[in-house]
């Protein structure tokens, strides 16, 4: 039985090789990607206002899709900080490697679409979800935790 199925699918594939091409041409222009669809990556800060990132560039090196770009800046005291931190949301595959490899826990990720993940926040403040303010408040809170 398996052999006949294999043989049938082989002939179907062989037949489709000689049929005219039906590939749809994709548009060249870039599509708009909403940041709230799959979440936001952002740097966290200490309560005193200093950023946690020490610009070790481990996140930049471990990213499989090369979505991060971190450039090192030096302060007057000789401390390193991230002078330039950019994330390409078109390249990011949301694997989370950058969050797990960070030694200072500087990169965090908002929890995708919050209305599905956080039922208590939806029950306590449904009007914030209607206007989209809940995402901004929660992201601002995570930034300083």
Curated annotation (Swiss-Prot):
InterPro entries according to UniProt: 4Fe4S_Fe-S-bd, 4Fe4S_Fe_S_CS, NADH_quinone_OxRdtase_chainI
Cofactor note: Binds 2 [4Fe-4S] clusters per subunit.
Amino-acid positions noted as binding [4Fe-4S] cluster 2 in the UniProt annotation, renumbered to this chain: 63, 92, 95, 98
Subcellular location: Mitochondrion
Residues reported in the UniProt entry to bind [4Fe-4S] cluster 1: 53, 56, 59, 102
Keyword terms, alphabetized: 4Fe-4S, Electron transport, Iron, Iron-sulfur, Metal-binding, Mitochondrion, NAD, Oxidoreductase, Repeat, Respiratory chain, Translocase, Transport, Ubiquinone
Family designation: Belongs to the complex I 23 kDa subunit family.
Name the record gives this protein: NADH-ubiquinone oxidoreductase subunit 8
Organism: Trypanosoma brucei brucei
């Amino acid at each position: 039985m398996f052999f006949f199925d294999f043989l049938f699918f082989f002939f179907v594939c062989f037949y489709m090789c000689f049929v005219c091409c039906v590939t749809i041409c994709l548009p060249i222009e870039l599509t708009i990607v909403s940041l709230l669809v799959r979440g936001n990556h952002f740097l966290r800060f200490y309560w005193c206002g200093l950023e946690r990132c020490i610009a070790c560039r481990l996140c930049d090196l471990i990213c499989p899709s090369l979505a991060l770009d971190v450039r090192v800046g030096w302060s007057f005291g000789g401390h390193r900080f991230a002078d330039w931190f950019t994330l390409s949301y078109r390249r990011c595959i949301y694997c989370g490697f950058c969050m797990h490899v960070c030694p200072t826990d500087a990169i965090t990720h908002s929890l995708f679409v919050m209305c599905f993940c956080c039922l208590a926040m939806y029950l306590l403040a449904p009007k914030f979800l209607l206007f989209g303010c809940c995402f901004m408040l929660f992201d601002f809170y995570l930034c300083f935790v």
